UniProtKB/Swiss-Prot annotation:
GO CC field: endoplasmic reticulum; endoplasmic reticulum membrane; extracellular region; Golgi apparatus; Golgi membrane; plasma membrane
SUPFAM superfamilies documented for this protein: SNARE fusion complex (SSF58038), SNARE-like (SSF64356)
Protein name: 25.3 kDa vesicle transport protein SEC22-1
Location in the cell: Golgi apparatus membrane; Endoplasmic reticulum membrane
Assembly information from the UniProt record: Interacts with SEC24A.
Alphabetical GO biological process terms: embryo sac development; endoplasmic reticulum organization; endoplasmic reticulum to Golgi vesicle-mediated transport; gametophyte development; Golgi organization; pollen development; protein transport; retrograde vesicle-mediated transport, Golgi to endoplasmic reticulum
Source organism, top-level taxon: Eukaryota
Protein species of origin: Arabidopsis thaliana (Mouse-ear cress)
């Protein structure tokens, strides 16, 4: 059964549309939505090259399609046929491109195409029951194959992003520490110069003062 559906722009991870009633009766729905956001973040960084992938998470599987810089993602039960999940996404993709194609790149706010929820709900109902003649025919369609689509674990996929975040954080910390070290080095050099030349400056100052006083008296 289809549990959740989201559409986002790949270039920046901006959510464009979603099924509004998704996740209402789903335990830990917030956790899964956070995982989806993390997946979109990874995709915006170009960390997953596959245009089609399945990502296992607990008792569910995320399936997604990337096309035209847009990611179409759904979360289904593990028992739900992979073939139907991707055909469901194909239907969403075709309609979304037809209706919103020219405006996708210029969308500036989250869920700019929230009205697309109507089509999501209508299409989801068609795919919920895998035993209907329509869906059985789709499962038997030999022209649409999903065997080549990779399946990975969510921790494996998100772990890549976490490691890159750690590297980025470490790099920022090292840069900050290098700046602090450079500033301290400048201060130490300045203090060393003062200690080196201060006595000389004092001697010259005393000599100059004595010379000036002598001239005044004479």
């Amino acid at each position: 059964m289809v549990k959740m559906t989201l559409i986002a722009r790949v270039t920046d991870g901006l959510p464009l549309a979603e099924g509004l009633d998704d996740g209402r009766d789903l335990p830990d729905s917030d956790m899964y939505k956070q995982q989806v956001k993390a997946l979109f973040k990874n995709l915006s960084r170009g960390q997953n090259d596959a245009s089609r992938m399945s990502v296992e998470t607990g008792p569910y599987v995320f399936h997604y399609i990337i096309e035209g810089r847009v990611c179409y993602l759904t979360m289904c039960d593990r028992s739900y046929p992979k073939k139907l999940a991707f055909q469901y996404l194909e239907d969403l993709k075709n309609e979304f491109e037809r209706v919103n194609g020219p405006n996708i790149e210029t969308a500036a706010r989250p869920y700019a195409f929230i009205k697309f929820d109507t089509f999501i709900q209508k299409t989801k109902k068609l795919y919920q029951d895998t035993r209907t003649q329509r869906n059985i025919a789709k499962l038997n369609d030999e022209l649409y194959e999903v065997h080549q689509i990779m399946t990975r674990n969510v921790q494996e996929v998100l772990g890549v992003g976490e490691k890159l975040d750690q590297v980025s954080e470490m790099s920022s910390r090292l840069t900050s520490e290098s700046r602090i070290y450079a500033d301290k080095a400048k201060d130490l050099n300045r203090q060393a110069l003062i200690r080196k030349w201060a006595p000389v400056a004092i001697v010259f100052g005393v000599v100059f003062l004595l010379f000036w006083v002598k001239n005044k008296l004479w």
